[in-house]
């Protein structure tokens, strides 16, 4: 299962590298107010497709690890739906498929948030309370950031925080569940 840990974590890192590099490559991009999906609009936009696929790979690999550990089919399916939605959002760019893209990103975050809620219940570890605190804490932070992003935080900042929270969750539990 060590190779699965490396795939999940490596895919999360690939997402970070892709999106961070696009911040520097795309001319005129405003990370404070523009959504991350808008990184796909410039001349190097294809990198964003690979970033979305890397994010989907990270989440689906974690789903597979969790399913192998505890056999929880509900959590497995929820995370796979989230991963598929992220992949779909990469395939359907925001400039051409605006409505579908936004719905896919929304559904992906909802499914991953639900996964954050469900995960501690299926882990049979001696540190179940610790797993719950981490998973539910990050899930709560995700929900809070979404709400604040709708009310007072600029959209670009809110979305980056949401992505960072999701990536932290994936990396922490890819590491914790495969040791």
For every predicted segment, state its role.
Residues 84-123:
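Membrane-proximal helix-loop-helix units in multi-pass membrane proteins
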Residues 13-29:
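Alpha-helical transmembrane segments of multi-pass membrane proteins
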Residues 27-34, 91-103, 151-164:
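Interfacial helix-loop-helix junctions of multi-pass membrane proteins
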Residues 38-57:
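Interfacial helix-start motif at the membrane-water boundary
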Residues 127-179:
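Terminal transmembrane helical module of multi-pass membrane proteins
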Residues 2, 64-75, 121-133, 179:
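Membrane-interface helix-boundary motifs at transmembrane edges
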Residues 74-90, 136-144:
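Small-polar-interrupted transmembrane alpha-helices in polytopic inner-membrane proteins
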């Amino acid at each position: 299962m060590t190779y699965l840990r490396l795939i999940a974590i490596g895919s999360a890192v690939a997402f970070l590298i892709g999106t961070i590099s696009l911040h520097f490559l795309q001319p005129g991009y405003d990370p404070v107010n523009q959504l991350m999906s808008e990184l796909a609009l410039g001349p190097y936009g294809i990198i964003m497709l690979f970033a979305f696929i890397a994010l989907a790979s990270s989440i689906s690999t974690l789903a597979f690890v969790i399913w192998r550990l505890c056999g929880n089919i509900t959590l497995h399916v929820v995370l796979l739906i989230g991963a598929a939605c992220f992949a779909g959002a990469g395939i359907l760019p925001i400039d051409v498929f605006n409505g579908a893209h936004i719905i896919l990103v929304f559904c992906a975050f909802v499914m991953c948030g639900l996964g954050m809620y469900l995960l501690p219940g299926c882990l049979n570890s001696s540190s179940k309370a610790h797993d719950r605190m981490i998973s539910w804490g990050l899930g709560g932070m995700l929900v809070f950031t979404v709400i604040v992003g709708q009310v007072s935080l600029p959209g670009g900042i809110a979305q980056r925080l949401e992505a960072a929270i999701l990536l932290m969750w994936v990396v922490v539990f890819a590491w914790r569940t495969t040791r």
